[in-house]
């Protein structure tokens, strides 16, 4: 059983899948894994559930979950974990992919609300999910896969809150790897560059920031959410 946050279905302008979370879910579904997927948008979650169950014959539980600065976040996350255990009885993998931000807004113009959006949806969500899943991952000798970003590694323009959240996730991941290794829990971080609906929107809304930040990988193409990002997680 895998819990994948931020796994709603999203389409690119050409109609292809544009969600890293859904790409990861697809890679796991092809291996026959049971899935618990979360997100803020119920329709995107429902669309993902219907597609995954129809195409791959797996069981998918979708749970609306929004970690933010005004919610009882431990209760939000504990509800997701409870539904996973009540339905499947175990958790083998936790994948923290969810992240919202006001990318493109320079640091001097960033508001507290925009900063909190990135920290709560990314860093705090990762923290709460890891804590809630820990006892179950200890039982299964499972794995945690967290998602960070080159935005923090390279100091991307207009991404101060996003970069701060992602660098916090990298630090949190390293500490968990140190502390949880004795429990047989494998903890890793991925910094992907895939062509997604969010990246497409970023390009259209902030063309200057996009040109400054997003460089073509040496392979000559952006990562495929399923075959190149999802397969790494599997």
Regions found by a protein language model. Give the residues of each.
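C-terminal helical subdomain
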Residues: 182, 189, 208-234
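Alpha-helical segment proximal to the catalytic Tyr-Lys
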Residues: 135, 178-182
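Substrate-binding pocket helix/loop in short-chain dehydrogenase/reductase
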Residues: 105-107, 111-116, 210-213
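Active-site helix of classical SDR
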Residues: 130, 165, 173
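Active-site loop immediately N-terminal to the catalytic Tyr-X3-Lys motif
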Residues: 108, 154-161, 182-183, 220
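Residue(s) in the substrate-gating loop at a strand-loop-helix junction
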Residues: 149
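Canonical Rossmann dinucleotide-binding motif of NAD(H)/NADP(H)-dependent dehydrogenases/reductases
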Residues: 1-35
